[in-house]
Amino acid sequence: MLLVRIKDGFSLKNFEGQYTVVSDNGELENTIVLTDTALFLWNLLKTREVSKTDMLNALLDNFDISTVLALGDIDVFLRTMKENGIIED
């Protein structure tokens, strides 16, 4: 089972009500604004390593969302974070 977590050196900033991922050293090239579900996943991955199944169950328990939509949100979140070097597995 693949476990992922947020790497050290990244944090959230709240800019006018939008949560944005920033690198602590200023090297993140892209601005990443998190949706509500992405923010939830971020907070989940900051606390511990989790599997995709853990993420799915947490979203379904905390949001009024279908399994298909939740899986899509997870895939987009993971792809975006991986492309920007923010998560490790």
Task: Give residue ranges: language-model regions.
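Long, charge-rich, low-complexity alpha-helical segments
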Residues: 30-89
